[in-house]
Amino acid sequence: MNETPAVPPSPEVEGSLNEQISHRRRILAVLDAMKDGRALLSARIENQRGYFNTTLLKIDAEKGYVFLDELAPADGHEKIAVGQTLHLYGFYNNLPAHFAIEVIHVGEHEGIAFYAGPLPKLIHYQQKRAHFRAYVGLGKELKVRLRKGDGAQISGRLQDISLGGFGALMPADSVFEDLEIVEVEALELPDHHAIACSAEIRHSHPTQGRVHIGARFTQLAPQAERQLLQAIVELEREQLRKQSRD
C-alpha cells in the first residue's frame, strides 16, 4: 500500500467541496485515475468515529462495482460490515475529493480483506485549485531561510504552509516590503526534506517580539509542489491525531 498518508479534509475544506460529478463516465474517469495513481484514501465509516486508510483495488465499469483494499489500521476492518456506508476522501489532480460507497460484500483474497460496493452516484470535489493552509504545531520546529535582493540572509520559523505560500515568524529586526521578491533558500518540511523556490512578500507586521510575514510562491517546481502537498497532508494528519487525543 502507498505510504503517503491520507487525511480527511477539515470541516472548512469539506464544506467547500461544492462541485459535483454525476455523469457516470466522468465518475469512472476520476476513480480510474485514483486507482492508477495508487491514491491513498482516508475512509470513515458512517456514524462512527475515526479514519482509516485504504486504496482502490479495481473498478468494474461493466458491472458497476468498486473494490477497496482492507482498512488500516486493522481495527477499521473489525468495525466494517455489509450494509454500512464508507465515506472516502482523497485527491484528484491534487484537489480534494469525497465520495461514498455502500458496502455490499466483504471478502478475502490471499489473506487480505477487500470490500465491494456499487459505483458512487456523486463525487464532490473542489473544482478550482484551492490553497488549503496547514499549521505547524508549537512542538515542531521547521525553519525557513530567505535571501533578500541585497544578499542578506534571514532565518525564521515556519508557521503555516499551503500550495500557494507560507507564513513565518522572523527576527524582530527583519524588514520586508510588500510585494518584495525573495529567494527561499530552504523551507523545511516535516519529512526532513527542504525545498527552494522564489516567493513574494504579501504582508509583514510585528507580533510578540517577532515579525510575521505572509508570502506567496512565485516559482514552484512540480517536484516541490508534490513535496508540499505531502507535507500539508502530514501536518493536517498530525492535527487530527492531536484533536482526537484532546
Curated annotation (Swiss-Prot):
Keyword Nucleotide-binding set for record: yes
GO molecular function, one term: cyclic-di-GMP binding
GO BP terms: bacterial-type flagellum-dependent cell motility; regulation of bacterial-type flagellum-dependent cell motility by regulation of motor speed
GO cellular component, one term: bacterial-type flagellum basal body
Keywords: Bacterial flagellum, c-di-GMP, Nucleotide-binding
Domain of life, source organism: Bacteria
Keyword Nucleotide-binding attached: yes
Subcellular location: Bacterial flagellum basal body
Domain called PilZ: residue spans: 128-232
Function: Acts as a flagellar brake, regulating swimming and swarming in a bis-(3'-5') cyclic diguanylic acid (c-di-GMP)-dependent manner. Binds 1 c-di-GMP dimer per subunit. Increasing levels of c-di-GMP lead to decreased motility.
Assembly and oligomerization: Monomer. Interacts with the flagellar basal bodies.
Family assignment from sequence similarity: Belongs to the YcgR family.
Protein name: Flagellar brake protein YcgR
Organism: Thioalkalivibrio sulfidiphilus (strain HL-EbGR7)
Taxonomic placement: Bacteria, Pseudomonadati, Pseudomonadota, Gammaproteobacteria, Chromatiales
